[in-house]
Amino acid sequence: MAAPVGAQARKLLRDLVLRPPLLAARSQVVQLTSRRWLNLQEYQSKKLMSDNGVKVQRFFVADTANEALEAAKRLNAKEIVLKAQILAGGRGKGVFSSGLKGGVHLTKDPKVVGQLAKQMIGYNLATKQTPKEGVKVKKVMVAEALDISRETYLAILMDRSCNGPVLVGSPQGGVDIEEVAASNPELIFKEQIDIIEGIKDSQAQRMAENLGFLGPLKNQAADQIKKLYNLFLKIDATQVEVNPFGETPEGQVVCFDAKINFDDNAEFRQKDIFAMDDKSENEPIENEAARYDLKYIGLDGNIACFVNGAGLAMATCDIIFLNGGKPANFLDLGGGVKESQVYQAFKLLTADPKVEAILVNIFGGIVNCAIIANGITKACRELELKVPLVVRLEGTNVHEAQNILSNSGLPITSAVDLEDAAKKAVASVAKK
C-alpha cells in the first residue's frame, strides 16, 4: 500500500479540493466565488460521466410535474430521489417560495414525486449559498435511490506542485474531506500521475485498495478510477471530485455525487460542454461584465476595485481591509484592454448603489496605462461620476497616462503606490 500523505495532504486538500479562494486580513475574511466560470448542473455532470462508462444512478430530468411523474414510473425503482437542480449547495435544507421545505426528497410512491415536483418547478429555492430570494428551479432530477453500504472519497485534480494530475482518495467519504485531512491525515492517499504515460493499472489498483475495496470490488473500483481519469483528460477538467464514491449492498461501485471543474482556456475545443453553461443563475451584473470580457465578483463593501489581474485584485481587496475599508467588488480587466472596456467597467461599478468610492489599481505590463487613462476620463465625463475616484497607475506609458489624468480637469486623486491608494480610498469614504 502507498504511504498516506500527512501534512502535505492538508495543504493539498485545502488548496485544491473545490474550495473558493479566501482573502484574509486581520480577523476578517472575504470568500470569493466566481460564478462566471463554467458550472454544470448535477444532471449534466452525471450524464457526462454516464456517457463515458462511469457508473451512476439511473435518472431522468424533468421540467414539469407531469414529466417528473412519468419519469418516476419509468424508473420502476424501489425508492426514488427527487432533486431540485440549481448550482448552489445546501439544497437538502433549503426552502421553496411555495412553502415546501427541502430541495431533495426520498419517496417510494411515483405520485408523490409529481406532487413534490409541482411545488419545486417554477419556484425559488433559497439555501445558505443562494441570494436571500433564492434561485428559480427550472428542472428536477428524478433518480433511482440506491442504498450505500460504504462511502469513500475520490478526486482527480491538477496539482501545480506536481506539474500534472494527482489522484486523491480517502476511505472516509460522504463528509467534508477537509475535516478528514485535518483530523485524520493518515487517511488521505495520493497518487501522482504522469500526464504523458497516463494512469497505470497499478496506481488505480493501489488507490482502490487504499479506499478499502476488497475482492471483486477492488477491480471494479480500479476500473471506475481509470474511466474517471480518462474523462478528466477528455473534457479538459481541472478537477473531478466524487463524494461519495461508494459501494452498494448488491456489490456495485457507484459515483453517487460528482462535481467537475473545467479549464476555461479549453473552451475552444470543448464547445459542446461550454454550451451547457447555465448563466441564468448568475447575477445580471456578472453576465453583463462577461459580455465585455470582464471578470466581476460582487462583495458587500462600498469601495469598488478596478484592477488588471486576479492576483493584483486580491491584493487590492486585502490592502483595503488592512486600512479599515471594505471592497464592494472584484473586477479584473485582464490583459489586452480597450478604452471601451474601461468605460463599461465604470458603467458597471457606478450602477452599484453600494459603491461610495472607486479605486483603480493598474500595473501596465501588457496593459497600456495611457489607454486606461483615456478610458477613465471618458467614463468620468460621460457618466458624470459622482463618487470619489482614486487612481494608481504603474508601468507602460505611465507618464503619458498621468499627464492625461492631471490635464483632464477632473477631480481624480492620484496615488503613488497601492498602500497610498488604499488609504486615500478609505479616507474618501470616511469623510462622507
Swiss-Prot record:
Residues 1-37 form a transit peptide. Substrate binds at residues 308, 365-367. The modification N6-acetyllysine is found at residues 73, 111, 132, 139, 200, 218, 227, 271, 347, 386, 423. One of its GO terms (biological process) is succinyl-CoA metabolic process. InterPro entries: ATP-grasp_succ-CoA_synth-type, ATP_grasp_subdomain_1, Succ-CoA_synthase_bsu_CS, SUCC_ACL_C, Succ_CoA_betaG_euk, Succ_CoA_ligase-like_bsu, Succinyl-CoA_synth-like. Pathway: Carbohydrate metabolism; tricarboxylic acid cycle; succinate from succinyl-CoA (ligase route): step 1/1. Its cofactor is Mg(2+). The modification Phosphoserine is found at residue 161. Its main location: mitochondrion. The record marks 79, 147 as: Important for substrate specificity. GTP-specific succinyl-CoA synthetase functions in the citric acid cycle (TCA), coupling the hydrolysis of succinyl-CoA to the synthesis of GTP and thus represents the only step of substrate-level phosphorylation in the TCA. The beta subunit provides nucleotide specificity of the enzyme and binds the substrate succinate, while the binding sites for coenzyme A and phosphate are found in the alpha subunit. This is Succinate--CoA ligase [GDP-forming] subunit beta, mitochondrial. It comes from Bos taurus (Bovine).
